Amino acid sequence: MCRLKQKRNALIVIFVGSILAALICSECLILNTTASVPRGLWLKLDTLPKKGDFVQVPIDAFSSTEWVPPEYFRKNMWGKRKPFLKLVAGSHGDTVELGDNGLILINGIPFPNSAPLSHDRAGRPLRAFTLPITLASDEIWLLSESPFGFDSRYLGAAKILKCYKAVPLLTF
């Protein structure tokens, strides 16, 4: 009886693991291992994001990427650039500027941990996006919860139609 239970449990684990692997490979599920947003498993939705939502964003959605060295782009197992997970901090009509304290201000309200850095943690130079900017109807401003996040501070506004809303399923 015990062996039968072990076999059944093993089959359940294999089945659930296979389903999760298929969903991750199909890019419906996102496994986040960075500190930009909470680490864990996220679900990608085909829904237009709004301010306060998290999004999955490809690098080509941003307006200022020509200066970025290739080593900034992590790749998946198929060699494709991995998209980022970021928080929508600003949207159509919002004004984004740099405050006196160095933090990004969105409509005059400071965003925590948002001061652009001159260098990353590896000592490589970073180029802050030129502010102020008022976001157009097709743009969103994406930030990270981490002071070291690589986001709109350096890459500019992102095209909203290239972004997918992402919701956390299991984070830690």
Please report, for each region that a protein language model flagged, where it lies by residue:
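A generic structural signal for residues embedded in beta-strands
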Residues: 57, 98, 142-143
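Short loop segments at secondary-structure junctions
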Residues: 60, 93-95, 146
